């Protein structure tokens, strides 16, 4: 969501960011200032503002669970004709009631005059770029693990500890 906001504010779009976390909304407001309108994620805010959307990007992530359906069919019908929904959460079931997985070969479909783009594994459309991005993000962790060993890395870095699933034959 934040990366989409960077691009959208860069082209002077009116950007609403919806999140459940007030702390996260404050962080984003500090970063973007008056370029964004932060909103608490609730049905009233979503219903009030969705009719203004030309582009809705659903970037919901609940680690280890399906994405909640935040956008109802009724909300979709209130959107402008030709509006676009990009449901990035489609890999976790999607956050829009009318979303269904599509492919790179057949990426879009229309429901109630609203275009839906719900391609699972969106980074797969740019494999070289996504591989470089993944390597850039994971390399520091790989180097730390190689330099410190897994036990020191786990004890000195909360990110490693949060990512631990199995250790010495035990599910953590």
Residue ranges and their predicted role:
Residues 20-22, 43, 61-62, 89-95, ...:
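Short, ordered loop/turn segments at secondary-structure junctions
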Residues 90, 95-172:
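Adenosine-phosphate binding glycine-rich loop
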Residues 1-61:
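Glycine-rich phosphate/diphosphate-binding loop of Rossmann-like nucleotide-binding domains
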Residues 11-13, 34, 67, 81-84, ...:
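Structural beta-strand/beta-sheet cores of well-ordered domains, especially the beta-sheet scaffolds
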Residues 58-111, 115:
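ADP-ribose/adenylate-binding Rossmann-like module
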Residues 8, 30-33, 53, 70-73, ...:
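Short, glycine/charged-enriched secondary-structure capping and boundary segments
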Residues 3, 19-23, 41, 48-55, ...:
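Conserved active-site and cofactor/substrate-binding residues in soluble primary-metabolism enzymes
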Residues 16, 39, 84-86, 117:
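Hydrophobic/aromatic beta-strand patches that form the interior of the parallel beta-sheet core
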């Amino acid at each position: 969501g934040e990366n989409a906001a960077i691009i959208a504010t860069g082209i002077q779009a009116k950007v609403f960011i919806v999140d459940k976390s007030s702390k996260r909304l404050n962080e984003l407001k500090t970063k973007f200032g008056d370029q964004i309108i932060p909103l608490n994620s609730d049905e009233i805010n979503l219903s009030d503002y969705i009719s203004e959307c030309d582009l809705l990007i659903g970037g919901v992530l609940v680690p280890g669970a399906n994405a909640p359906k935040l956008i109802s069919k009724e909300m979709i019908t209130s959107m402008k004709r030709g509006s676009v929904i990009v449901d990035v959460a489609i890999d976790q079931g999607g956050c829009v009631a009318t979303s269904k997985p599509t492919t790179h070969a057949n990426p879009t479909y229309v429901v109630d005059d609203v275009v839906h783009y719900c391609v699972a594994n969106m980074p797969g459309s740019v494999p070289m770029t996504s591989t470089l991005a993944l390597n850039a993000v994971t390399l520091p962790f790989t180097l730390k693990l190689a330099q410190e060993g897994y036990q020191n890395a786990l004890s000195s870095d909360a990110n490693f500890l949060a990512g631990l699933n199995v250790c010495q034959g035990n599910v953590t």
